[in-house]
A protein has these predicted regions:
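Accessory RNA-recognition modules of RNA-modification enzymes
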Residues: 2-230
Length: 230
């Protein structure tokens, strides 16, 4: 079997700092590496044009590579300040809603073209129906416990009882949710740190992913918008 030709730009598992230049099919950001050998494209999901990111190559071929987002080092000039804690599940929350709609529409149309082979999709596509609520629209949220936390100051892992979400790109590390994420009930999320303290005071251990031991693993909350009850 002939050996597959590799590119001269990146290797699998290599960690790079990349400038996202454009937005591509499937909701992936496009970064490019330039050298004497030419230009090489790297696709990074959950990123925005203008961001400087740290990413790890997880797929490499002759013509392009795909990378997993590790961290956003510098924001895009399109991003705006929001009063919410950033979480992995909402990578576009700092974009104005008009730009969110633009990128999501472009991504949807490109899927119909590239996978569905529908060339005239623009003529067939009726405008999507926007949610009446830009924020706090979810009626269910699942939080995870972890015995390994993320230090936002040192940007390293540490032994800590955490309750929140998995750190982006790391299955075994938790990131405490200390305030409203903008997705679920504000009062509930502002008080999640008190629930975490209650669990700590119980003396029972949070889930330790690598060791697969621990008592607290998931915390699931549902909300009824009809009765405004959790």
């Amino acid at each position: 079997m002939p050996r597959r030709e590799r590119n001269k730009f990146v290797k699998k598992n290599q960690v790079l700092e990349l400038k996202i230049e454009d937005y591509a099919f499937g909701g992936k950001g496009i970064a490019r590496i330039h050298s004497e050998d030419g230009s090489f494209v790297i696709f990074v999901p959950n990123t925005l044009p203008g961001q400087l990111v740290k990413a790890q190559i997880n797929k490499s071929s002759k013509n392009y590579a795909e990378a997993k987002l590790i961290d956003v080092l510098a924001p895009s000039e399109d991003e705006v300040e929001v009063p919410y804690q950033d979480i992995p599940g909402a990578p576009y929350i700092q974009l104005p809603i008009e730009l969110q709609h633009k990128y999501k529409k472009e991504s949807t149309l490109s899927l119909f073209k590239k996978i569905g082979k529908v060339e005239n999709i623009e003529a067939l596509f009726d405008e999507f129906v926007s949610s009446p609520n830009v924020f706090h629209y979810r009626n269910k949220m699942e939080y995870g416990f972890s015995a390994i936390g993320y230090d936002r100051v040192t940007k390293r892992d540490k032994d800590e009882f955490t309750l929140g979400f998995k750190r982006r790109g790391v299955w075994w590390m938790g990131d405490n949710l200390d305030k409203d994420s903008g997705l679920f009930d504000k009062q509930m999320e502002d008080n999640l740190k008190n629930i975490r303290q209650y669990c700590i005071d119980s003396g029972l251990d949070p889930w330790h992913g690598p060791k697969r031991v621990g008592f607290f693993r998931y915390f699931v909350v549902r909300k009824s918008f009809k009765t405004n009850e959790l």
